[in-house]
């Protein structure tokens, strides 16, 4: 009986150690995944900046450039929603993405302002998100 008890305690200790190791590995992997999401978010913000510059400096085919801008902004939006503890920033990015899709005529007139906002966000400045909310508030949401 004593042997069974000792072996049960040893097995319990080994199981507890294994559980702690797996929990540690899970936490470490979660941090790595979040770092990957953040780096992809930054990379896609860079693509949006390039698309904005391309649109603003172009003379031809602006429709194709705008579609590319919307596509890259959708990627930024997707990665923003994967990042933990990023709620207010997610709202700002989502609203910009929605405005680009729903109000293209209005947003085309505000792309220089949007470029400054994206630049501030890329540089980790909170004023970028604040200005994004101001930009969205300035839109006529009943119009096109």
Predicted regions and their residues:
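Contiguous hydrophobic segments
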Residues: 29-32, 78-92, 133-144
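C-terminal amphipathic alpha-helix
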Residues: 105-144
């Amino acid at each position: 009986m004593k042997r069974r008890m000792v072996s049960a305690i040893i097995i319990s200790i080994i199981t507890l150690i294994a559980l702690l190791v797996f929990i540690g590995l899970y936490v470490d992997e979660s941090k790595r995944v979040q770092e990957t999401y953040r780096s992809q978010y930054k990379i896609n913000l860079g693509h949006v900046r390039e698309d904005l510059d391309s649109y603003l400096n172009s003379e031809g085919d602006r429709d194709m450039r705008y579609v590319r801008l919307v596509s890259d902004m959708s990627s930024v939006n997707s990665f923003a929603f994967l990042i933990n503890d990023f709620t207010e920033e997610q709202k700002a990015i989502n609203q910009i993405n929605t405005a680009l899709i729903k109000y293209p005529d209005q947003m085309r007139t505000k792309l220089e302002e949007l470029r400054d906002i994206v630049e501030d966000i890329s540089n980790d400045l909170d004023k970028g998100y604040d200005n994004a909310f101001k930009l969205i508030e300035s839109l006529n949401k009943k119009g096109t």
